[in-house]
Regions:
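A surface-exposed partner-binding patch
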Residues: 1-101, 168-210
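A ubiquitous, low-specificity "background" feature that marks scattered single residues
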Residues: 110, 130-132, 156, 181, ...
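Polyanion-engaging groove/track-forming segments
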Residues: 55, 89, 120, 153-161
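Compact, glycine/acidic-enriched structural inserts
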Residues: 111-150
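Generic detection of long, well-ordered alpha-helical segments
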Residues: 4, 25-29, 120, 124-127, ...
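An amphipathic alpha-helical core segment
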Residues: 135-179
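A contiguous binding-surface segment within folded domains or other stable secondary-structure elements
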Residues: 86-118, 122
Length: 210
C-alpha cells in the first residue's frame, strides 16, 4: 500500500524547519517499518499552530530531537489498568487537546490516552495516516483560521469535507462516531461520551478559530 504522505507534501504545508526527523540510532531497534519511514524521512510537525504538540522532553539539551520516552515513564503509569499487552513500551509522541499521543512500535498503530481516563483509545491505524491528518488540517488552515486569513466564508463546509477525506484515508477514528455538528446526536448532553480527539479538532475547524 502506497504511503499517504511524503516529505514534499509536508513541506508544502509546514516550514521545513518545523518538521522534525530522527536519526535511526535514536529509534527503537524493533519499530514498525512504516513508522520508521515517517520518523526518519517524512517528519512530525513541530509547530505551535498545529493541533499536535510534540513531547517537550524531545527537545531537552543540545542534541535534539532526543529519543522518545515510553509510556512506562508516564507520571501516572500505575493508574492505567487493563491496557494492551506491551503498552509500557509505546513511544510518547506528544499531546492533542491534553490527550497523550502514543505509538505502538510493534503494530505501528497510534493510540491516545484520554486525559484523566487511564485507558487507551485507537487514534489511527498507522503513523502514516496520523501525519496525513495533520497535513490535511494544516493545508486547509487558511479556510478556518482567522490568524492567517481575513475572511473565512465556509469553515463548516471545510470541516465536513476534511472529515470525509480523513475517513477515506483511515476510517478507524470515526467508526460509530457522529460528527460534532451532527443533528442526530447531542454531544453536549450530560450523558454524552467524551468526543474523540480528531472530532474535537474538526469541531474547531467547523466553528473556525483565531
Amino acid at each position: 500500500m502506497s504511503p499517504l504522505v511524503d516529505r514534499a507534501m509536508m513541506e508544502s504545508a509546514f516550514p521545513p524547519e518545523r518538521l522534525e526527523i530522527w536519526e535511526d540510532e535514536k529509534l527503537p531497534a524493533r519499530l514498525h517499518e512504516s513508522a520508521r519511514a515517517i520518523l526518519t524521512d517524512v517528519g512530525l510537525p513541530h509547530d505551535r499552530s498545529s493541533f499536535l504538540q510534540l513531547d517537550g522532553r524531545l527537545f531537552d539539551g543540545d542534541d535534539s530531537p532526543n529519543k522518545f520516552r515510553t509510556c512506562a515513564e508516564l507520571d501516572y503509569f500505575s493508574r492505567y489498568k487493563d491496557m494492551p499487552r506491551g503498552w509500557e513500551s509505546w513511544l510518547i509522541i506528544g499531546e492533542m487537546f491534553y490527550d497523550v499521543v502514543t505509538l505502538d512500535t510493534r503494530s505501528g498503530t497510534v493510540y491516545c490516552l484520554p486525559d484523566g481516563e487511564y485507558r487507551a483509545h485507537r487514534l489511527n491505524q498507522s503513523l502514516d495516516s496520523f501525519v496525513y491528518f495533520t497535513y490535511l488540517l494544516e493545508v486547509e488552515r487558511p479556510h478556518y483560521d482567522f490568524t492567517v486569513s481575513d475572511e473565512i466564508p465556509d469553515s463548516e463546509g471545510v470541516a465536513i469535507s476534511l472529515r470525509e477525506r480523513m475517513i477515506q484515508a483511515d476510517p478507524v477514528p470515526f467508526e460509530g462516531v457522529e460528527p460534532a455538528w451532527s443533528e442526530a446526536f447531542d454531544w453536549e448532553a450530560g450523558d454524552a461520551p467524551r468526543m474523540p480527539t480528531w472530532d474535537v479538532a474538526l469541531s474547531n475547524v467547523y466553528e473556525s478559530i483565531g
